[in-house]
């Protein structure tokens, strides 16, 4: 799924919301750097006082395809520091 953001196209990934009491996944825009490595982007409605993201905007993450309620989607599973170590 593609989301237009500024002058480039970004992918949509899912990030876990913390402190919700149940598993909640937030769709967020992300810039793909490699096949499974993304930088989480800041959507216009981002408000850290309302939602606590496991990986906030600016975080470099590794994603895996996971089954969620509505299908299989790329889900951020861990933070990484180096794009070369994520393959």
Predicted regions and their residues:
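Mixed-charge, low-complexity intrinsically disordered regions
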Residues: 2-87
């Amino acid at each position: 799924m593609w989301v237009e953001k500024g002058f480039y196209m970004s992918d949509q990934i899912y990030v876990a919301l913390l402190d919700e009491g149940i598993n909640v996944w937030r769709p967020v825009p992300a810039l793909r750097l490699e096949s499974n490595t993304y930088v989480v982007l800041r959507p216009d409605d981002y408000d850290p006082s309302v939602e606590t993201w496991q990986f906030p905007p600016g975080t470099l993450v590794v994603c895996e395809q996971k089954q969620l309620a509505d299908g299989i989607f790329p889900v951020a599973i861990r933070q990484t520091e180096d794009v070369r170590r994520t393959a």
